[in-house]
Amino acid sequence: MLSFVLLLCVALVNAYSDPGACSGTCWAHDPNVIRRVSDGTYFRFSTGGGVHISSASAITGPWTDLGYALPNGSIVTVGNASNLWAPDVHYVDGTYYMYYASSTLGSRDSTIGVATSTTLEADSWTDHGEIGVTSSSSTPYNAIDPNWITIGSTPYLQFGSYWQGLYQVEMTDSLSASSSTPTNLAYNASGNHAIEASYLYEYGGYYYLTFSSGKAQGYTTSLPAQGDEYRIVVCRSKTGTGNFVDKDGVSCLNSGGTTVLASHDYVYGPGGQGIINTTSHGIVVYYHYANKNIGLAVDDYQFGWNTLTWTDGWPVVA
């Protein structure tokens, strides 16, 4: 009986809610979601080609495929300019800025670029190319997975994948990074240093650095050991520019990180996340995941979201 009770307690502690409803075009990879200021329409941007765009009247859908932000690819000269990754879109003074990465799998020959639009619609974007954040085999970081935030009045860009982890650099404006040396925010010392997809979110006097840890794809070829697949993790900081720690006080630079969402039931490898305050469901974390009932290939990935609550100052999937 005692063993049964203990197992039940563990199951309850590790239980996650199923993803929220999604209708229409629900494929997504490294999704980024933003609401248009003029009418509240939701736009979802995803990795692939010139960046996939979908729109919907609500986070639940129905999502409609609109095409690509940059149908002819980017003007950047590093990586694969016709297959752009991990878009991150923000609104500043009447203009939407879409940061994206150009690279190839397993390489540090990478760069981050930016495009602008006033409407968010497909084929309305003007590409400005590289912002000055580029990496190579001689840099400790990989210049992919951009994420923009303003701390106080200063804009910053978070980025990084594997190698020495996640970094942050100050921006001179929305189109270009400063020449300052990027600051290391988080590092995973274990295995092949699987850490990427940073997303920094301010709430309740803290800056929450969410990121994805674990194997992101290739599940149809070989599944990683249980628990080594993608999952969403968090550390927090008072300043947003360093000293990130997890719930147990472990530094994010020392492999720290508290799990927010991991595989469960039919959900496998959730990650590539972001956070948005919705009109009907409050603050939600959104992400892509492989649905075991559909398939484990990248082309089968699904858009997921869950409501977030905060317990003792830490985000919890409701």
Curated annotation (Swiss-Prot):
The gene is abnC. It catalyses: Endohydrolysis of (1->5)-alpha-arabinofuranosidic linkages in (1->5)-arabinans. Its main location: secreted. The keyword Cell membrane does not apply. Belongs to the glycosyl hydrolase 43 family. The record marks D145 as: Important for catalytic activity, responsible for pKa modulation of the active site Glu and correct orientation of both the proton donor and substrate. This is Probable arabinan endo-1,5-alpha-L-arabinosidase C. It comes from Aspergillus niger (strain ATCC MYA-4892 / CBS 513.88 / FGSC A1513). It comes from the Eukaryota.
